[in-house]
């Protein structure tokens, strides 16, 4: 996602046509390291704000997040074996992304479907209405 999908595809195809396996340049390696550092910092920040609560008969970690949800969810679950899954709430996008690394839960069926969403056993999502954002504002400024 650093280069954009189309540019990346064209780059890969030209490398393959040149009969060389796509290799990253030193510049590419630096860019990837910078991006990985950004992701790592974001995960550490969100780890500090995560809270846990029961949900759907399991222990859920809750965090407000709008970026890097796959990396964030998987890493938080690995950092906190006491949680069964994590729910990442994107208040601006009105979405919730669910992630787990455990085998005994099907997030699509056991969690997301209860909130009008769906997905796979280890990755799922659901949406909520704009009115929820208004309720949050009312609660904060009440």
Q: What does each model-identified segment do?
A:
Residues 36-142:
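Gly/His-enriched, cation/cofactor- and phosphate-binding structural elements
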């Amino acid at each position: 996602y650093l280069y954009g999908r189309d540019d990346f595809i064209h780059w890969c195809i030209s490398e393959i046509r040149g009969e060389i396996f796509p290799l990253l340049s030193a510049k590419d390696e630096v860019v990837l390291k910078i991006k990985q550092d950004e992701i790592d910092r974001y995960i550490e920040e969100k780890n500090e704000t995560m809270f846990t609560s029961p949900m759907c008969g399991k222990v859920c970690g809750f965090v407000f997040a709008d970026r890097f949800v796959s990396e964030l969810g998987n890493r938080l679950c690995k950092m906190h074996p006491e949680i069964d899954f994590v729910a990442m709430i994107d208040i601006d996008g009105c979405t919730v992304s669910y992630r787990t690394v455990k085998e005994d839960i099907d997030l699509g069926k056991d969690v997301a479907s209860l909130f009008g969403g769906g997905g796979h056993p280890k990755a799922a999502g659901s949406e909520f209405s704009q009115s929820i954002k208004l309720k949050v504002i009312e609660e904060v400024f009440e």
